[in-house]
């Protein structure tokens, strides 16, 4: 909300490329950022229109290129009608993971400078988990990305990981640094890794 200036902040500052975000026009600022949420909202419309948001400046080639880039083309082709498949209200015809993939394609098409993933992988089904992991890596490459996650496999390759407990920072570092300490991150990672081994067996 603050990065998109849905609310104006009273203290501190947020910069984008070294420029205070309050110096940007709202339209330019919001086109420079993309947010992928856990609860993806889709309109009762085709997949294509849900990706482009009916923006006439976005071409079919861009949509197909973005879909390939996040590794979702096979998923789209398996649907009746492909990009013309109607997802119905709130995407009720799709699984949680499939809705997430569409939101990833949408974000890729708009090519934001800053990407925010807010628990975007929290409720995905096993069928699309690997697709989401690949899509996350490809979507975050080469751009500033802020990832809010409880699923630590999502953030393992992040340059910097900040561990919060009730809104307070308790640890900071990359994955290797945090695993080298006997802290909250390492304990949670080991629990999640053990759970994934049991699930796979």
Protein language model annotation of sequence segments:
Residues 1-6, 30-39, 47-50, 64-72, ...:
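ABC-family ATPase nucleotide-binding domain "signature/switch" substructure
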Residues 51-60, 74:
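ABC-type ATPase nucleotide-binding domains, specifically the catalytic core motifs of the NBD
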Residues 73-80:
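Conserved H-loop
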